[in-house]
A protein has these predicted regions:
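Pore-lining transmembrane helices
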Residues: 2-350
């Protein structure tokens, strides 16, 4: 028995299959976030830019980039796990299946299933004389089978978060602002799609405004409080891209998530009770935050389409809720935690 275990361990080592929290929780998660940024998020930014400038080509290009988010995330994970070329390329199909079948939980489904498919592909790679057939076939069949079996259930987890958010929308504005802001903001940072959840729930009005506040608190909060470690590049990639880039760091030290989450708990009720910030644009914009400024553009288009007379108070509220307060509050909370030793130098390094 002991000899058999040693034989398996030796085989895994030869195949570079390292079952560890660091490889799966840090390396794979970080790579997935980059894959998401290089497809859905940069595509959203390009598409939004095209819509605002009236450039159809940019709208089309952005749409193409966003459409391959699943394959991009899966390939990124395979690269981080040192998948062989045939296995790496085969993960493109796996990512497409997992993302589509996972619905609002697509990114999480891609993350879990791509890891398994990549590792299985590594185990069979170059073990036969027909490797060009075996490795892609095994990788794709394992990945797509797992997607068909489990991705819908993973999507149901994201839908459960959506149900919780819907319950929160029925609360009075103060509590609703806190709960919706915190939940949607956390969903944005987690490997689930906050935008898809908001779209599925039709999250607009005051609840949509609270969702925007929560997403901005996470994105701007992480971008500003990690500026010392990540500079301008980190400021832009998180502030206009996604706070999910910080997930590996959150897994290492969950306390890094406290500052932007506390900021969301404050800006949410301010948005609903003081500024009456509403999202009357597309519901999907409620879950985008500052990604390509989609959230802010959604609020603005809602103002215009509703025929609302936009006042200086409205603009001040939008700027404070989306940019100023998240930056200031997250920085203050982060500095307090740094002084307590809960957040250390390098904890937020991308």
């Amino acid at each position: 028995m002991e000899q058999a275990i040693q034989s398996v361990q030796s085989f895994f080592k030869r195949k570079d299959v390292v079952i560890s929290a660091h490889r799966y929780g840090i390396d794979a998660m970080g790579a997935m976030a980059q894959g998401l940024f290089a497809s859905l998020l940069i595509g959203t930014i390009i598409k939004t830019l095209g819509q605002q400038l009236g450039l159809a080509f940019l709208v089309t290009a952005g749409g193409y980039a966003a459409a391959v988010a699943g394959p991009a995330m899966a390939a990124s994970i395979g690269y981080a796990l040192h998948a062989p070329q045939l296995g790496l390329f085969s993960l493109i199909a796996v990512g497409g299946a997992a993302n589509e079948l996972g619905g609002a939980g697509g990114p999480l489904a891609v993350y879990l299933i791509a890891i398994i498919a990549a590792e299985v592909g590594k185990l069979v790679s170059k073990e036969t004389k027909i490797d060009i057939l075996v490795t892609p076939a095994v990788t794709i069949l394992v990945g797509v089978s797992l997607s068909a079996l489990f991705a819908p259930s993973i999507g149901a987890v994201a839908s459960a978060v959506g149900s919780l958010i819907m319950w929160a929308t029925e609360l009075q504005p103060l509590l609703m602002g806190i709960v919706v802001s915190v939940l949607v903001g956390m969903a944005l940072t987690l490997p689930i799609s906050s935008a898809a959840i908001c779209a599925a729930l039709g999250l607009t009005g005051l609840a949509g405004g609270a969702a925007v506040a929560g997403c901005c608190a996470q994105m701007v909060g992480f971008a500003v409080m990690s500026y010392k470690e990540n500079g301008v590049g980190g400021l832009v990639s998180q502030g206009l891209g996604t706070s999910m880039l910080q997930m590996p760091n959150i897994l290492r030290n969950p306390r890094t998530w406290i500052p932007p989450t506390l900021a969301a708990a404050i800006t949410g009720p301010i948005a609903t009770c003081l500024f009456h910030l509403e999202m009357n644009g597309p519901a999907v914009s409620s879950g985008m935050g500052t990604c390509g400024l989609v959230g802010q553009i959604g609020v603005y288009t809602g103002w215009i389409e509703s025929g609302k007379a936009v006042t200086a108070f409205d603009w001040i509220g939008l700027v404070l809720i989306c940019f100023v307060l998240p930056a200031v509050l997250s920085t203050i909370f982060c500095e307090v935690l740094r002084k307590k030793g809960w957040i250390k130098e390098g904890d937020l390094k991308l």
